[in-house]
């Protein structure tokens, strides 16, 4: 097995591990969901863990399964582009970008749950890396991602997405997540460029 295949394999296993944790949280039902979700009023009251935990609980099993399938697909598509420590950094920057966007640009958003914003960030970071390495398919992925974001900002959630997830879709999460992930990808690209021999 070559290095790239090993990295893809490891990324898929990491995605499954994340999904196992997310599924365990879902087993807790509504009480766990309400305790962990991004909740503006509760965060204002000092429950700052919600800034992180809210991205790992879901509206229900259909929402979780939809995001789980997305996570596995993204792990397969871009998992080999970064080491696991870099993916952790990408996740932190993506979540930070989303939380800053929610807090300062979406004050009307009282609560939020779900992985979808983080998924957009992971895909964006991997896509930046793919484009940097001149992999043509990532230009296509970038165009698709940009088109999806533009559609959502102009017209709202994609048709059928709210029905399949079991609730309202916060399209701002996709935008902020993408921006956070793209920033992380660019930072890694700049770091590699500065470290390259002249």
Question: What residues fall within each predicted segment?
Answer:
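Hydrophobic core of alpha-helical transmembrane segments in multi-pass integral membrane proteins
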Residues: 13-26, 142-146, 182-186
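Transmembrane alpha-helical segments of multi-pass membrane transport proteins and ion-pumping complexes
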Residues: 23-27, 99, 103, 122-125, ...
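Membrane-interfacial alpha-helical segments at the cytosolic side of multi-pass membrane proteins
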Residues: 65-82, 122-132, 179-192
